[in-house]
A protein has these predicted regions:
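Bacterial N-terminal signal peptides
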Residues: 9-18
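Sec/Tat signal peptide C-region and signal peptidase I cleavage site
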Residues: 19-25
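N-terminal segment of the mature folded domain
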Residues: 25-110
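Bacterial N-terminal signal peptides that target proteins for export
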Residues: 1-10
Length: 110
């Protein structure tokens, strides 16, 4: 379990490193997505906040589809920085991201 937590924390750190410059204007990372992944993501976010110089990310449980929809709406401080999903992104969701300027998408499987 400790290895899994360490890997997840590392994955979150990598995701944070990839956050766009406009999102860095905000002092908190915003994460939306899967209600299934939410309890696990909450623990990871809290540990990240305790063990780094960054504030604990703000999490919102929206469901996988809802999170991907919000994430793909655009780039900037008014949009989520990261989305969690209990499934792979659909091609239609990927295409929606691309058409809204969300071009740098990295999947991290846990």
């Amino acid at each position: 379990m400790k290895l899994k937590t360490a890997l997840t924390t590392a994955a979150l750190a990598v995701s944070i490193a990839a956050v766009s410059a406009p999102a860095m204007a905000r002092d908190t990372i915003n994460i939306v997505g899967s209600s299934t992944v939410y309890p696990f993501a909450t623990v990871v976010a809290e540990r990240f906040g305790r063990n780094t110089d960054f504030p604990t990310p703000k999490l919102e449980s929206t469901g996988s589809g809802g999170g991907l929809k919000l994430f793909c709406e655009g780039v900037g401080t008014q949009y989520p920085d990261i989305t969690n999903s209990s499934r792979r992104m659909k091609k239609s969701e990927f295409d929606n991201c691309q058409s809204n300027g969300v071009e740098s998408i990295t999947e991290v499987r846990i």
